[in-house]
């Protein structure tokens, strides 16, 4: 599988007691080289999004479905997802977040086991395995399409309003 082509396992990082877990699809080249999730340009944008929402990278937990980089930056294959999904589920059981933020269509379709468009899933509360989930654009998509940033921010605001309600905290 992917173990033969990767440099590092990119398991995830952040607060193991986080109330928010951010999930992408798979590590990219920079993440594979460093062994850390979301460290390239997409990660820098994710950090800015989190900061705008009132969180630091250290307060949340950030991971991907796949723990190894697919060659050529391709989408994960079904057997790779089946191999890695138990690791993601164990991470979520240990952390037990209040909210999960899924980044992008591939991550959302994979986790929710559906084929819906990103537009049909974005910005609204979805429940999966007892977790409250929100879906927005992947930061890499925002870098390619800056006009989507407004929609992403609306999604993040919806997530934060929900977070404030369930955690009894004021936000935004």
Language model feature labels by segment:
Residues 1-172:
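A polyanion-binding, active-site-adjacent surface
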């Amino acid at each position: 599988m992917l173990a033969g082509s990767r440099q590092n396992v990119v398991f995830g990082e952040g607060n193991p007691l986080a109330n928010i877990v951010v999930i992408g699809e798979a590590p990219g080249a920079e993440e594979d080289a460093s062994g850390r999730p979301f460290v390239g340009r997409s990660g820098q944008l994710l950090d800015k999004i989190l900061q705008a929402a009132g969180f630091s990278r250290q307060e949340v937990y950030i991971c991907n479905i796949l723990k190894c980089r697919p060659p050529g930056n391709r989408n994960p294959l079904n057997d790779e997802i089946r191999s890695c999904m138990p690791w993601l589920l164990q991470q979520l059981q240990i952390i037990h977040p209040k909210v999960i933020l899924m980044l992008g269509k591939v991550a959302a379709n994979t986790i929710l086991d559906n084929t819906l468009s990103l537009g049909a899933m974005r910005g609204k509360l979805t429940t999966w395995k007892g977790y409250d989930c929100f879906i927005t654009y992947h930061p890499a998509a925002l870098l390619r399409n800056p006009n989507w940033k407004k929609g992403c921010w609306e999604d993040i605001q919806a997530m934060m309003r929900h977070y404030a309600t369930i955690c009894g905290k004021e936000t935004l």
